[in-house]
Amino acid sequence: MEKNKSTAIEIAESSKESKGKAPLLAAAVGHDRAAGYKRGVSIFDLFLRISAATAALAATIVMGTTEQTLPFFTQFFQFRAQYDDLPTFTFFVVGMAIVTGYLILSVPFSIVCIARPVAIGPRFLLIVGDTLKAVLATSAAGSSAAIVYLAHNGNSDANWLDICQQFNDFCQRVSGAVVAAFVAVVLLIFLIVLSAMALRKN
């Protein structure tokens, strides 16, 4: 009888210990799963960030090197079109250069988020910076898109002639730069959404 009682007591203690360890084990598994999810988001963030930087850099270089001179000229005039003839395109180059610089400098923060997926500080800085630069890129791309539209179609009410019939290469390059800028804007929006998803998991 004493042996049976002793055996019963040992089983009860073992059961009690396992009940105490079960919540801790479940919490650890949940923490690892959340960290793995955030690490996956951070890796995708890094890929999109590099892609956005590439698009913004391409837009800056293409617009900043856009120039066309027509093969005919007069004694007093030479027909040439450059991006800096229009203040809107100058703003585009400066704005997209700032966006490019920010995206390149933000890559180390994205890498930190991969190494430390549960860290909130770097992710919060990224979402603030991405939002500000998305606004800048949108304003640069949107204002330049309006000028490109006028260059292609003109405005008969204001007697603004379309110049793309004469400066075809110029218009193609500035149009390509604006398209690349909008690609960067879309990628920045995706980056903001990813950062919001990662912060929401906290």
Swiss-Prot record:
Listed GO CC annotations: plasma membrane
Cytoplasmic-side segments: 1-42, 112-130, 195-202
Subcellular location: Cell membrane
Extracellular side: 64-90, 152-173
Signal peptide: none
Keywords of this entry: Cell membrane, Cell wall biogenesis/degradation, Membrane, Transmembrane, Transmembrane helix
Keyword Glycosyltransferase part of the UniProt annotation: no
Bilayer-spanning residue ranges: 43-63, 91-111, 131-151, 174-194
Pfam annotation, one family: CASP_dom
Membrane topology of the entry: Multi-pass membrane protein
One GO process term, biological-process aspect: cell wall organization
Primary location class: membrane
UniProt KW Transmembrane keyword: yes
Subunit details: Homodimer and heterodimers.
Protein task: Regulates membrane-cell wall junctions and localized cell wall deposition. Required for establishment of the Casparian strip membrane domain (CSD) and the subsequent formation of Casparian strips, a cell wall modification of the root endodermis that determines an apoplastic barrier between the intraorganismal apoplasm and the extraorganismal apoplasm and prevents lateral diffusion.
Family to which this protein belongs: Belongs to the Casparian strip membrane proteins (CASP) family.
Matching NCBIfam families: A_tha_TIGR01569
Name of the protein: Casparian strip membrane protein 1
